[in-house]
């Protein structure tokens, strides 16, 4: 198997900005591991070896020096305890993970077991290791599956999932190895920011994390902010009137939609109509900024966001569908005003009102780990971005057995109707042989439409989409059964292998003779990684398998990004029943997909530029607050600014009580002022695009405003601390938290914000709208201005 490694080195030569990895060195280390044999050692002897390794590390021996012995030990114990002995490729992956790299391993190659070796090695230090899984189900599954290995070796293991109480979480994080999602770990980090007592902290200092489905978390979800919010008493805004106004608008007359269907903007006629109906006067006047923001949210909710595609309604709540996985994005919200607008659109009672107390993007949260590694089936295509954003290198791990999956050329059609008819016929023909089929769709709507058609044709199928993702493990486990037909939205990040013959592989031989799992994609996705992950569900561990994509020139991806304009128009006049066997068209579609990937990469970079300053400020505030909380930061503000009052209380209540009072007041106002600052930043960010009217750079202006506001916030913290201290009634028992209004929110909740990149791509449309509003000065002046603008735009 190790002979295949040389081919991996050659593959890296095809990539720009490559880093040459010494795969031969990995091979040498694996051979050293294989040369050590613990088969004749008793269980007691193996445990003694593990204890000796722990002592060596505590004495200061570098982890690299005990790697070979540690990995050999895990190899032997895994075979005894869970009946799984790591393959050589898994050992290679383990070495790379220990080195803090991202490994690309194909589906079914054993990422779960690969992570055990570096997790054990790094946990020997006693500082803790987090294995960050894709969802709660996998966190608990992997804990129960791999936990016995760690226990045998004398290390503790735990897991964290949603709905665990704080004490359960605290105990889990104190274990040597903790299985938890990146989201839950991040939420607990934010909860710690609100703690006023050290005993209430959940996390200990971060050490080392291994991230599963790394490209999904590090790239696709990198900019998604984790949020903790507290309850507020203010009433929500009633959107009914705005919804009524927006529903009266006519497309292409009162509003326009951009080419990517990302943004909607009012025309001059639409602007006049809204100003007349609402009676607000100039909609773009400064006093109407909040109304304008809400109106834009209603426009977005009504016109751009589609039920069953972008979200579903379940149990009276809006649940967002993740564009990459096709499943409900757990605890995900759009920014408050937009989410409230969607709730109003669907006639739901808004449950989103609250003040954001703290937030951090996944990208920055993961950087808090001093050492980070990752695993995924698709990393090579984003290796440059991983390097740029995280300084993470990628290592391609060869498969244990050669991949014999047959990937057929795409079937391309001019129209959706013919594509779907051919697709259904293909499924019928394959199903008649008993070969299991997995159909990957792009939306809930499409998955249900195909399932309905198949049922009409007498073909029973299982459906997995955002509406029933809690049944995911059960449905996927049986997708490889003889005769099974499974219709699913995107398979990315599912984390569950499809075994031929079903979960227990009862019909394995039968399915193998039929060609293994047959994967069908109903369209291309914005990222080729998603397509490749779908293909990768077939052909695991050297199994047979097949894959094929059915594409229409009317597919959303083709139309949305105008890939259709790259294809000669003569093909659009054909309503053929056969697919277009045309390599030129296929190349154009592939090229268009790469352009879209580049566009999305640029957007992620742009979002990073807007968030960088805020993140640096967050880091400063969190660090300062933590130092105060754990008594590493001396408190001298009150003794310096209010010396007379401070000395009086010092004599009255003593040093310890007075220190506790100052600490309580300080922590409260840091939280309060930071929450107010985040609210202000959100408000500024919503309207920052308007500065282009003054010919300013929006990014530079945003950074300038936030830096100035941050400095003001620091001053306000000091002022509020002093003011509270002067007014407070300090006794030997301290201060009455309730009476002095120093108590934080009575309840908090956590969620993620779908941080839309599109708010920064709508500048031309906003400029256009603002220019329309100039007619409030003078109709004659406006006509001249618009004529001038039109000439400039045409040029």
From Swiss-Prot:
Membrane topology, from the record: Peripheral membrane protein
SUPFAM superfamilies referenced in this protein's UniProt entry, alphabetically: Helical scaffold and wing domains of SecA, P-loop containing nucleoside triphosphate hydrolases, Pre-protein crosslinking domain of SecA
Cross-referenced NCBIfam families: SecA2_Mycobac
Gene3D superfamilies attached to this UniProt entry: Helical scaffold and wing domains of SecA, P-loop containing nucleotide triphosphate hydrolases, SecA, preprotein cross-linking domain
Protein role: Part of the Sec protein translocase complex. Interacts with the SecYEG preprotein conducting channel. Has a central role in coupling the hydrolysis of ATP to the transfer of proteins into and across the cell membrane, serving as an ATP-driven molecular motor driving the stepwise translocation of polypeptide chains across the membrane.
Gene Ontology terms, MF aspect: ATP binding; protein-exporting ATPase activity
Family listed: Belongs to the SecA family.
Catalytic activity: ATP + H2O + cellular proteinSide 1 = ADP + phosphate + cellular proteinSide 2
Enzyme nomenclature, EC number: 7.4.2.8
Organism: Alkaliphilus metalliredigens (strain QYMF)
GO biological process: intracellular protein transmembrane transport; protein import; protein targeting; protein transport by the Sec complex
Main location: membrane
Keywords: ATP-binding, Cell membrane, Cytoplasm, Membrane, Nucleotide-binding, Protein transport, Translocase, Translocation, Transport
Sequence positions that bind ATP: 90, 108-112, 497
Cross-referenced PROSITE patterns: SECA, SECA_MOTOR_DEAD
Membrane-spanning ranges: none
The protein's name: Protein translocase subunit SecA 2
Protein localization: Cell membrane; Cytoplasm
Gene: secA2
Subunit structure of this chain's protein: Monomer and homodimer. Part of the essential Sec protein translocation apparatus which comprises SecA, SecYEG and auxiliary proteins SecDF. Other proteins may also be involved.
Stored InterPro entries: Helicase_ATP-bd (IPR014001), Helicase_C-like (IPR001650), P-loop_NTPase (IPR027417), SecA (IPR000185), SecA_Actinobact-type (IPR026389), SecA_CS (IPR020937), SecA_DEAD (IPR011115), SecA_motor_DEAD (IPR014018)
GO cellular component, one term: cytosol
Domain of life of the organism encoding this protein: Bacteria
